[in-house]
């Protein structure tokens, strides 16, 4: 019991004091503003997430007014005209919340750096690579092939915002910072939108999105503390996919690893080729828990998690938010992809003395596909095509120059190819490329008041060559030696570590 309690309690040694004085420093707001650039970058606009209202003059004025304590008094008589920070309440509150979010992230950033430096002989990894959305998919490729059932969990929101404040008390002992946090939650937040919203991923305020996402993630982090203990108890060594045993290139590496483990401890070898007990991933207000075993075991997991979250995390949780699905017969919308696990047949020839025989093996493979129907629906919603996928012109962009129109369409096409580079089948991407290319041609023809054929004859087909060379340029830079066999590269899945948000057209949910 003591060991379980130790895992459930956060690391108290990582608590940090005196965070509140940082809110009066000018560089905090500059760092917070720069850190938030392009966090909501769209493929349709240049810099929609850029807030051009920030200036050092406003920051100085804000800090000066914060030193005057009477500006923190809340007027209960008039809720529309609050005395907080004068007339620019919305702008100042947004700036303070962004700065405060940057400040409270400092203890977590220090803890992340210290944990990453403990691996590979105190070598610090590039932590920003871990933020990439694509970094999750290779992790799933190596693990999901072992598992049978999956729990689809819709993560609930806390029943009261005071619970969010209580989760941070383990990390921040500065009472002033916690009081300021309560002030923001009760003064600038609609409680009903947080608790009763039907779309948990979009229930946050757009202006203070980073601030409230941080609070929510820290809260879910405490709810997930039990998985650390269960994972450590389920396996002692990092498992390797059994599909690699069929490849001769990995055989000698397995032998060397076996000898290494035999020399240390014989009992540990029992865990070497043992499949993982469970696998947990959280994304977009949802989470999936995959595990070995039968349907009965997953049903026990379901009721265990519900009871644990209700008692330990004060969650209003019910079993209807968890669904059990068989992994091989179920596909899900996973971060813009249509993900599933399919059986990949493999035949191995084995020879024993003078006799040889063939062995058929069906290996589970994590498959990622482009959801063509929802993606065409997103293109139709953005007025690039009809609901049936027929390209149409974009009248809103017809007032722009030809180069700007081509650049916008080309940027959308490049971003979609970049995001869906990990797709198992890329043929659907070329259909999207055809829609965007013809929509661009129709938009240019509409601007010049002519037909598409007449415009292309007059301007030349090289005007749209950007659509032809976009993915070739990316692949030639990524794989300089694969230019002769570029078709083989197209068929392979490529995961990038520079994708920090889902594009508008990819986020079709």
From Swiss-Prot:
GO terms for biological process: mRNA processing; RNA splicing; tRNA processing. It comes from the Eukaryota. GO terms for cellular component: chloroplast. Disulfide bonds: none annotated. InterPro entries: Domain_X, Maturase_MatK, Maturase_MatK_N. The keyword Membrane does not apply. It is found in: Plastid, Chloroplast. Keywords: Chloroplast, mRNA processing, Plastid, RNA-binding, tRNA processing. One of its GO terms (molecular function) is RNA binding. HAMAP family: MatK (MF_01390). Usually encoded in the trnK tRNA gene intron. Probably assists in splicing its own and other chloroplast group II introns. Belongs to the intron maturase 2 family. MatK subfamily. This is Maturase K. It comes from Nicotiana tabacum. The lineage of its organism: Eukaryota, Viridiplantae, Streptophyta, Embryophyta, Tracheophyta. The gene is matK.
